[in-house]
């Protein structure tokens, strides 16, 4: 540091020793400039900080995509700077955030979900506040958020992560395990007090009786569901329906059934969670997936089952019908045992035991612009996820689906995305659609990801 300051001082002396500068001028103005420039030079010297071997990596949350709904939780993206005119340094509004942006949060987030223009975050904390919401709230899918100007009114847009109140009996003992979001409703899964639902219940998707002409805007209503044969271990919101998986491996559903997405053998609405039968009868299910109107389920022995909408060939391997109202076993050759499934609006994906990703349906499926539709799964080349002869151990460990895009996490902590890049939802720095997996760069290691319609949220760990 001293050497840098000495060099800076010598350079300064040479500049000030020119004609017209006397000794008094050097003493008064030159000395202050010398100190200032020496300080600036010292500040430019890189500082190396060493991290201990036992230092904990910090939790991070990154968001990107369309911001004007408030779903990204960054108010400055939505609200213009206050004041009569532009201020120096004021940030302009940002309609689209095309690359990952770090969301400043004090809480350790364990689950995230993206709805149609809104976001839920949850933590397994023992604190009273366990869930935070942001974004569109016209159906109270984020709960009631009281207006600061009028205490009797609530916000229809929540621009920053705000606490969601849950009617917990034992708030310091109960933990929130997972959140899920649909088009205008939300589910919150707890470990001790069942499942809570909020938002639009026009089709019974919140698991309660449909009330004619019910007003959902600025509603305080949070419904609790506990009438399951077993403990619910996973929830999944479709567009206007809900799925519940219990620790007994059984699947329950409620909500809109016009495409058969409730899987209950009819096409009507169902306002109370009801157990599915069909080919799922007696099957031990370990995961359910839905987001649009098609549903998939994975069994413990690696089997795959599907029901609901099949207009885009999602279930064309077993039926010509475009609506399937009971679960059907999908016998796909060459896929192997299925570990995970993801289901969007028109496309589906599964991950097998070898870490390979298979896609089918309609749209941008991930194998280039020539593959537009397929009734049977097509494997995406593992090399597109980073597999090489120098990195032979790389494989995909987790898959997710938004309405029209996909995401995959690898065992090396890398996130790949592909599909329709609606309002920059892929986070790849440009707005064009992506026809094959592309790695998303961010200052952290992704551990989980949530996909919406036009935005995404990633939970990550700091590198050091």
UniProtKB/Swiss-Prot annotation:
Subcellular location: Mitochondrion membrane
GO cellular component: mitochondrial inner membrane; mitochondrial matrix; mitochondrial membrane; mitochondrion
Ranges of the RCC1 repeats in the UniProt entry: 58-124, 128-191, 193-247, 248-300, 302-353, 354-411, 412-461
Pfam families referenced in this protein's UniProt entry, alphabetically: RCC1 (PF00415), WD40_RLD (PF25390)
Tissue expression as described in the entry: Ubiquitous.
Coiled-coil region(s): none
A single MF term (Gene Ontology): rRNA binding
Stretch forming the transit peptide: 1-37
UniProt keyword list: GTP-binding, Guanine-nucleotide releasing factor, Membrane, Mitochondrion, Mitochondrion inner membrane, Nucleotide-binding, Repeat, RNA-binding, rRNA-binding, Transit peptide, Williams-Beuren syndrome
Biological processes per GO annotation: mitochondrial fusion; mitochondrial large ribosomal subunit assembly; mitochondrial small ribosomal subunit assembly; positive regulation of mitochondrial translation
InterPro entries: Mitochondrial_GEF_domain, RCC1/BLIP-II, Reg_chr_condens
Main location: mitochondrion
Its job: Guanine nucleotide exchange factor (GEF) for mitochondrial dynamin-related GTPase OPA1. Activates OPA1, by exchanging bound GDP for free GTP, and drives OPA1 and MFN1-dependent mitochondrial fusion. Plays an essential role in mitochondrial ribosome biogenesis. As a component of a functional protein-RNA module, consisting of RCC1L, NGRN, RPUSD3, RPUSD4, TRUB2, FASTKD2 and 16S mitochondrial ribosomal RNA (16S mt-rRNA), controls 16S mt-rRNA abundance and is required for intra-mitochondrial translation of core subunits of the oxidative phosphorylation system.
Disease tied to this entry: WBSCR16 is located in the Williams-Beuren syndrome (WBS) critical region. WBS results from a hemizygous deletion of several genes on chromosome 7q11.23, thought to arise as a consequence of unequal crossing over between highly homologous low-copy repeat sequences flanking the deleted region. Haploinsufficiency of WBSCR16 may be the cause of certain cardiovascular and musculo-skeletal abnormalities observed in the disease.
Subunit structure: Forms a regulatory protein-RNA complex, consisting of RCC1L, NGRN, RPUSD3, RPUSD4, TRUB2, FASTKD2 and 16S mt-rRNA. Interacts with 16S mt-rRNA; this interaction is direct. Interacts with OPA1; this interaction is direct.
Domains (record comment): The RCC1-like repeats assemble into a circular seven-bladed beta propeller structure. Each blade is composed of four antiparallel beta-strands with loops between each strand.
PANTHER family listed in its UniProt record: RCC1-LIKE G EXCHANGING FACTOR-LIKE PROTEIN
Protein name from the UniProt record: RCC1-like G exchanging factor-like protein
Highest classification ranks of the organism: Eukaryota, Metazoa, Chordata, Craniata, Vertebrata
